[in-house]
Amino acid sequence: MIVREANKFDLDKVIDLVKNFYDAVELDLKNYGDLDLEYVNKLYHHIILGAGIAIVAEKDDQLVGIILALKNANIFYPDKTVLNELLIYVEPEHRKTSACYRMLSMYQKLADKMVSNDEITTYTVTKTEHLDQIKFEKLGYRKSEEVWVAGA
């Protein structure tokens, strides 16, 4: 398995992974209608042009996992930038492999480099139900908050 930064040639496969993620998670956002693939396309290009990080896991020329993260201004300190993970997804048949761990390791290395270069101050990951087996504390993260969802 290869873990690498995603590029413009991965677009179609990345879109497929985002669709699979969207279908797999229990998001209340599904009430909004179909996934806006044009927006996903624009967001992906924005990320790979420097607004974040896109990492993929590839096996036998197929993308089997993805991490997308986007730089945002800190809500309290607008001159500080935070890298927020948007999604972490591994295809179900590859979840008992090292794909997720290896992508997270690469995410940390790239994000740590961004911290060292003063591009960002901190970076985040979100522990969704599909990632409940990962011990983020052992990877150096500390719990900051929990997210609860209500409404449509």
What are these regions (language model features)?
Residues 2-16:
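A short beta-loop-alpha structural element at the N-terminal edge
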Residues 22-42:
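Conserved GNAT-fold acetyl-CoA-binding loop/helix
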Residues 42-56:
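A short helix-loop-beta-strand connector motif used in the catalytic cores of GNAT acetyltransferases and
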Residues 56, 62-71:
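Conserved beta-strand in the GNAT
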Residues 79-92:
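Conserved acetyl-CoA binding element of GNAT-fold acetyltransferases
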Residues 90, 96-110:
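Conserved acetyl-CoA-binding loop-helix of GNAT-fold acetyltransferases
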Residues 107, 117, 121-133, 151:
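Conserved beta-strand-loop-alpha-helix junction that forms the acyl-donor binding cleft
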Residues 135-146:
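Conserved acetyl-CoA-binding loop of GNAT-fold acetyltransferases
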